C-alpha cells in the first residue's frame, strides 16, 4: 500500500449548501469550513485549531467558497456555546437525510460532516473486503463518536478508558488510556507477547 487515494466519497455542492442552510437556521452560532484532499476553505468566524495555516484569510460566508464537491464539512462553535455532543444531536436531527455527522473530540465544539452512510466503520469494512479480510481479522481502538462505527464493526475492538463515556457500549473491550500504553498492552496480549 502507498499513499494513493483509492476511493473518495464526496458531498455534492448542492448537499453542502443545503447542510449549511439548515444548520444556520438550527444553530446560528455555528461557523463552517469545507475540506478535501487538495482544498480547504473556512469562514472568518471559524477559528482554526488543528487546521491553522490552511486558510489564513477565510470568507465571510462559506457558501461563497463552496464551488465543488468536498470530503468533509466542519462545523464549529468557536465560543463554545455548545458541546460537540450537543452539536451532533442538533445536526443529526436536521441533516441526517443528507450526510453523516460525528465528532472526534469532546474538548472542542466541533463536528465533522461526511457523505451519507460514510464512516470509519463502513470504510474499514470496504478496505478489509478488498484485502480479503473480515471483521474477525480486524482489531480497532477508538475513543470518540467518530470511532463508534469502527468499534462496532471489528470483532476485536477496544474503547479507550479515558475516551467518550459512550465508547465502551460500542466496543467489545476497554483498553487503558494511551498514556498508560493501553493500545500496546492489548496488542501484546493479542500477539501473546511477554509484557
Q: Model-flagged regions — what are they?
A:
Residues 22, 26-141, 145:
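Conserved acidic, metal-coordinating active-site core of Asp-based
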Residues 11, 79, 175:
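Catalytic cores of large soluble enzymes that bind and process phosphate-bearing ligands
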Residues 1-17, 23:
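Glycine/small-residue-rich loop that forms an oxyanion/phosphate-binding "nest" at active or ligand-binding sites
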Residues 4, 9, 109-111, 191:
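Flexible, active-site-adjacent loop/turn segments at secondary-structure boundaries
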Residues 1-4, 67-69, 106-107, 152, ...:
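Short glycine-enriched loop/turn motifs at secondary-structure junctions
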Residues 112-195:
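Mg2+-dependent phosphoryl-transfer enzymes with acidic/Ser/Thr/Gly-rich catalytic loops
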Residues 9-11, 52, 116-117, 152:
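Short, flexible loop segments at the rims of nucleotide/cofactor-binding pockets, characterized by
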